[in-house]
């Protein structure tokens, strides 16, 4: 990897320049992405439709919802609402060949933000080997509890969305969940790259 510095001196020929210096660039997710996703997916309605199902059936239904949400997120994030962050992540990937965690993390963040803009969540670790996401206030878990669905069938939703994002980025991943709501006051997901992946 080359840098723009050598022995404390600037090497101008190695510095990356902006395409159009002085032009304002959009780095934040567009509100339209959130509006389109929340318009298409109604968490409350989904929870009510699962009311008479057992945990296994609810898990399968939520897996499908997670896949569909991530597919829509990827479509919107890569086309209609492609922002500067997305452009730069792809540019760096093409230059370095390093996909994980940036590409997968972007899709995960946008899907959480898109469907659940008021949830409390945080990426606590993002290295080339592991991505750790903590969700401490989850509107999906809350909606399921409100209609009397017990257990954690929403785990299927999260796992399926991560796997769909990994399919898009080409990352072979393992997913662990060492902490869960309500016991640990959060769900914590550990997404790691498989050896050789």
Where are these regions (language model features)?
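ATP phosphate-binding glycine-rich loop and adjacent ATP-lid/helix-beta elements
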Residues: 156-162
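N-terminal accessory segment detector
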Residues: 1-131, 137-156, 175-187, 193-197
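Low-complexity, intrinsically disordered Gly/Pro/Thr-rich segments
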Residues: 163, 167-179
């Amino acid at each position: 990897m080359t840098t723009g510095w050598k022995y404390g001196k600037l090497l101008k020929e190695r510095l990356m320049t902006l395409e159009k210096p002085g032009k304002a660039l959009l780095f934040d997710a567009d509100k339209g992405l959130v509006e389109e996703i929340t318009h298409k997916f109604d968490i409350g309605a989904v929870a009510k439709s699962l009311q008479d199902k057992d945990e296994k059936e609810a898990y399968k239904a939520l897996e499908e919802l997670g896949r569909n949400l991530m597919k829509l997120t990827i479509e919107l994030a890569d086309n209609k609402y492609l922002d500067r962050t997305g452009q730069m992540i792809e540019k760096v990937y093409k230059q370095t060949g390093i996909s994980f965690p940036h590409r997968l993390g972007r899709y995960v963040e946008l899907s959480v933000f898109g469907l659940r803009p008021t949830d409390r969540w945080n990426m606590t670790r993002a290295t080339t080997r592991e991505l750790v996401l903590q969700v401490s206030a989850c509107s999906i878990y809350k909606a399921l509890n409100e209609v009397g669905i017990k257990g954690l069938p929403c785990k299927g939703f999260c796992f399926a969305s991560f796997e769909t994002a990994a399919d898009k980025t080409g990352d072979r991943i393992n997913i662990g969940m060492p902490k869960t709501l309500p016991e640990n006051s959060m769900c914590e997901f550990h997404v790691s790259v498989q050896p050789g992946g």
